[in-house]
């Protein structure tokens, strides 16, 4: 079990276990519309059912870390998509497990 290094409070309604992760990288940074830049804290809910358009944390089978992406469901096929259009769609075909759905963000402005 990993040691907890920081505690954050939230009034968000969480249906399962909740945990915060800090965004690393620019795959969720967009030039227009919703953007979640590097350094932002995101609260994930493990008990919430992911839907089309949900922002999710997922563990890819062949990766050592989790990925934070938007879930796209199109014609029965599921994909993970960054908000940054420079990143490709990741087809979901048994190659990942969705761990939780994002319910809140928190970031410092200075």
Predicted regions and their residues:
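Short acidic, gly/pro-rich beta-turn/loop elements at beta-sheet edges
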Residues: 31-33, 54, 66-68, 81, ...
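Short, compositionally biased
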Residues: 54-78
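Glycine- and charge-enriched low-complexity intrinsically disordered segments
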Residues: 72-110
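Short, surface-exposed beta-strand-loop junctions and turns on beta-sheet-rich folds
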Residues: 37, 64, 86-88
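Residues located in well-ordered beta-strands
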Residues: 22, 43, 67-70, 101
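A short, contiguous structural element within a folded domain that forms the immediate neighborhood
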Residues: 1-62
